[in-house]
A protein has these predicted regions:
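Beta-strand-rich solenoidal segments
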Residues: 49-166
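Glycine-rich, flexible loop motifs
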Residues: 1-88
């Protein structure tokens, strides 16, 4: 598909018009990215074949970009083993290390996004990982956690002793 200039966008390309307006949206899931248990400690995200998986990720300065599952196939993520006592709250996070720029030869710049599970801490009253913990996990995955864009796609409570998510 080509991106053209159109009077409807006040002389801007449709991509420029979208980027100028993305700030009006909150970060989070726009459509899709349904999360469901698979086998054992694995969950599947998105790829239901009918809904495009789209989310808005945000950086530390509040700048935003979209994250898409362009394969439209479910993505499997395996969670860490359950704690032996108490429960914990884990997150599944999509991140973009360096926001991709438009390219005529690379459709949606595949490979520019990481998808990771961020473990919470087991406790009698567990809480989800905070921004600092998420950015530390992004850095451990090989990206620049201090500047990456990210979006939480799923929140999963892992009960003590669980071997099969339901």
């Amino acid at each position: 598909n080509s991106v053209g200039t159109n009077a409807e966008y006040d002389g801007r390309t449709s991509v420029k018009a979208f980027n100028d307006n993305i700030g009006a949206y909150s970060s989070g899931i726009l459509s899709g990215w349904a999360c469901s248990p698979n086998t054992g400690m694995t969950v599947s995200l998105g790829g239901d074949g009918t809904t495009r998986d789209i989310a808005i990720a945000e950086d530390v300065s509040g700048n935003k970009i979209t994250v898409n599952n362009i394969s439209e196939a479910p993505i499997s993520v395996t969670m860490s083993a359950a704690p032996s006592t108490n429960s914990r709250i884990d997150l599944i996070v999509a991140y973009v290390d360096n926001p991709p720029q438009g390219s005529a030869t690379s459709i949606d710049n595949p490979g520019a996004c990481g998808l990771i599970a961020v473990d919470g801490t087991a406790a009698a009253d567990p809480v989800a990982p905070n921004d600092s913990a998420i950015r530390t996990a992004i850095t451990a995955d090989g990206a620049s956690g201090s500047t990456a864009y990210y979006v939480v796609l799923a929140t999963i409570t892992i009960a003590s002793g669980t071997t099969d998510l339901t």
